[in-house]
Amino acid sequence: LVGTQMIAKGLDFPNVTLVGLIDADKSLHVEDFRAAERTFQLIVQVSGRAGRGDRAGEVIIQTSTPHAPPIQFARKSDFEGFQLEELEQRREFNYPPFRHLIRHLFRGRNPEKVNFYIEQWAKVLEQAMGDSIEIRGPAVAPIEKIRDEYRFQLWYFAPSASQVIQRIVSLREDFKMDRDVFDQIDVDPMQLS
């Protein structure tokens, strides 16, 4: 059986006795605080494809970081241990669920114009809310261009998303941009790209 990550998603192959996972740690090296969680989930899910029938299964994992916690916890199917380790890491760096992460994406066909508006917005926000939230950016989004639109982003960290969003929406209503520049806000986004 040869496949992509798709084979991890709930398919039942009762005669599969060997599963190999190539570059299992590749997802660990992306700019996303959930990278360890996604890596752990993928390994556990793919491992679950082997040995579903009457015959025992075996899993071979290729990794360049065999001692990484997600790899080791997945190797032992230690869900509780992984959860405790991951929560401790997130507490240490103050990532969700310990505070909210809000992504503010600006996009448009003219990169200079998009960059101009996101920089102006960052100044407005810093002046109005700099004491109540942590602002990171602006920066080019990890996927810089989609469908001929350039993308830039800001990140906001806050203890309460609802209060911050209300204030941001209020400020945003008074912030004028050209019609060909768009923005969107995502609270605790699942994807950071």
Per-region residue spans from a language model:
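Accessory helical-bundle/CTD segments and flexible terminal tails appended to RecA-like ATPase motors
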Residues: L1-E31, Q45-S193
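Short, conserved loop/turn and helix-capping segments at secondary-structure boundaries
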Residues: F33-F40
